[in-house]
Amino acid sequence: MSADLTWLLIKNNNSFLIKRSGVQFSKEAGNLLNLNTFKFSGIANKKTIDIAAAASGRGVVVSTPKTKVTLTKGIRKSARSVAGLTRAGYRADLRQAALARVAAVLATQKPVKVAAKKASKGVRANKN
């Protein structure tokens, strides 16, 4: 079945579709922006890229329909390899979305800095 025909069949009704506040989102694998559009659809297109957090909690899993690779080197090297994958003729139109997704997933894995408690100043604050 062609990609266009598949999209016509699933665009208004599928199990991944979320319709809220006049906007349609999609939870399908391979949809980088989670938007219900033909360009980003993981079901309608043959060539898809799925980027998700690694199960170990460190790194990202980049998967295509044929391969699956876990990238754990850091944000710059991960972004470079994802950009290389998309630039090499494999869905070059998804490059910006893929890089944004890698950056967002890796940003969530950074440890949260604990802010130091501010020292109280003044005569009344130090009076005990």
Regions found by a protein language model. Name each.
Residues M1-N128:
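Compact, Lys/Arg-rich rRNA/RNP-binding cores from ribosome-related proteins
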